[in-house]
Amino acid sequence: MSESIPKNIILTTLDDAINWGRKNSMWPMFFGLSCCFVEMMGSMTPRFDLARFGAEVLRGTPREADLMVIAGTPFKKMAASMLRVYEEMANPKWVIAMGSCANSGGMYDVYSVMQGVNQVLPVDVYIPGCPPRPEAFMQGLMTLQEKIARKESPARPVLNLRGGNEGTTVPILIDGSSKTRDTRGPGYGHCPIRGTAQQHPDFKGHRAAGMWGPPQPKIAFSASTAPLLEQLRERFGDDVRQEEGADMPTLVADPAQVPELLRFLKQDIDQPYERLEDLTAIDETARSQRPAHDLTMVYHLLSFERAGYLRVKAPLRNDRAEVPSITGLWPAANWYEREAFDMFGVRFAGHPDLRRILMPEGWQGHPLRKSHPSRATDMPPFTRDTATTMVPPEGSHFFSNRAPVDNQSLSILNLGPQHPGTHGILRVILQLAGEEIVDLDSEIGYHHRGAEKIAERQHWNQYIPYTDRIDYLAGSLNNLAYLYSVETLCGVEVPPRARYIRVLLSELFRIASHLVWLGTFAHDVGAMTPVFYAFDSREKIFDIIELITGGRMHPAWFRIGGVPDDLPDGWLAAVEAFTRDFEARIDEFDRLLTGGPIFRARTEGIGTVSRQQAVELGFSGPNLRATGLAWDLRKSMPYGGYDEFDFDVVTAGGGDCFARYLVRLGELRQSLRIVRQAAEGMPQGRWISDQYRYAYPKREDGLQDIESLIHHFLHVSRGPAAPRGECYRAIESSKGECGYYAVSDGGTGAYRLRIRTPSFPHLQALPQLSRGRLVADVITILGSLDYVLADLDR
């Protein structure tokens, strides 16, 4: 070797050569669980260009993948499927835990969530953040590359010799043994919890419940309410009682009377209540002033003609927790009643298929009962053995109780719970005659994060970050929906400047959400280009949002009474630069898709629903407006200052996938109009309310007077005490109507918080939209509905 080595010759070891090839051509499995996966997808777009690392092509089957990125929350119901995918992956293989939830459960120490995926899978690299930015994911990938290059010796295993190592070699962690069960999460070893050794860290030590507070302010009802109440007295007499509702007219009836009362309200009155808005229950057993009954069934109805809501309540006792089903009156009631059965144990006589919907079939107890544990760390440790008890049932199980189809040879096709076409962890089971869909069922709950249960242990302000993660593509729109209900409950007036800031951010997030939908929907039907344009524009929106709030997907920026800070220097120039260019980008989307023969063939006449069917099924938002009904809460029931803006309600005819596309494309233009108006007309003045009983005081006020300082201390520690009462309010979110039903017992947090999301009724309609279509059409229909799994399962 005395001669010099030519420049085109490289000397290395076999270990280094194998490691070099592996680390520069990672094959990630397509495995998205939650919010983090959206940021992971962002790393594959032009701004970040993951292709530089040779890892930009996600594999649709585990047999072609060697890297599993647990991007998002690891759910207990998903554990068995997660293990199955991992076991089918090629060797050697590696695991990255992306985000706080995957690392440790994050902010979701709740009954349905594993406190870290490392309880069932070995993890090579942990990426912090909630969610991590695309840059953080790329840093995690480089960390894994470095681990492969420095710590693995694959030559001997490759040559079938003893010794060496490759792939993941770390052990899984045992909850409570090799892994902490501290309710505050990892990293607190040997750090004492607050209070004494005899005191639970969640002790209720404040005096808010015993202090005087103002009553809930009463909203003036419409003039049509009095004639309606008179009609009810004539028809039902004393069988239906009026309750003193402060937010909407409220009726109380015995359970047996409920179906007839609801039928009367839907069919027999002028200006009927056509849509079942929501159906839920309240466990009354922990009330400070406990009523005689144990449970209350609550029905919320919507009248399009009255532009208003009505509430019906039915008291129940634990020993007779049964009410007649109303699925014959509203098909949308099917899933709502199953959820009430699952979460509360309420039975519905006459329901066609009463079974659990969110929790696994073998789950013990009903999670929204006050007696059910809230925290995962208060329950037995979750292990691989536990996961084996939650294996999803066979596909044939879902059709075993249905009438057989004569003279057809049928097959079962399982789609999900992990499939690129389902846009998240959702299982769709198809019953097929050849390629034609005879019947269809959905298994949901794989993304259930216990959001409503968590609200019962957080104070009103602490819960705001959790709302960001309901529809994790809608950002501040979630905050607005929650705060609209809480502010109405408390009677808080939001200053004009704060209203405009909220509208500005909400419409930017509406555009960002529609862009993700547009790009992925186009991709579903074979158009590859739009998704890159869509994510490019989305990143420009996030630049503005980050400038104003400091965050991207989940800024948690709204507060009771306004926003936490004023707009920063440079915000107007950033908004104007975006609005100047984005209109041309909308035109590009229009040219790319609207006239495309393949796009139209895949979408026109597919997944058709009439206006009447859409109302019966609980549709809202763009999916409802695609049937020709011009119903938009921003116009029909204005809130948050939207009555000060000039924009059109976009509708389309046909009620098919193409009509739903046209509505959302048009809404991009209308939201752009609103953003421009908000920027140009931004008023001066306060950005947070001066009603400091409920709102955070401005910093300078806290430095000037003791009252403001005391309120700030109380709001940060125990939280504001809301009046005893209840309030349901909804907003027009990007996917439809998102409403919060806040029930207060006079304390600093919700006694019961119900979240009415648009994704839940929309996905319930999938069988009606799909029967008689082909398998390929299901992917198109799913995409056209625009749902998010966290919005669906909460």
Swiss-Prot record:
Residues covered by region (NADH dehydrogenase I subunit C): 230-383
Subcellular location: Cell inner membrane
Entry-linked Pfam families: Complex1_30kDa, Complex1_49kDa, Oxidored_q6
Superkingdom of origin: Bacteria
GO cellular component, one term: plasma membrane
Bilayer disposition of the protein: Peripheral membrane protein
Function: NDH-1 shuttles electrons from NADH, via FMN and iron-sulfur (Fe-S) centers, to quinones in the respiratory chain. The immediate electron acceptor for the enzyme in this species is believed to be ubiquinone. Couples the redox reaction to proton translocation (for every two electrons transferred, four hydrogen ions are translocated across the cytoplasmic membrane), and thus conserves the redox energy in a proton gradient.
Similarity section: In the N-terminal section; belongs to the complex I 20 kDa subunit family.
Protein name in UniProt: NADH-quinone oxidoreductase subunit B/C/D
Gene name in the database record: nuoBCD
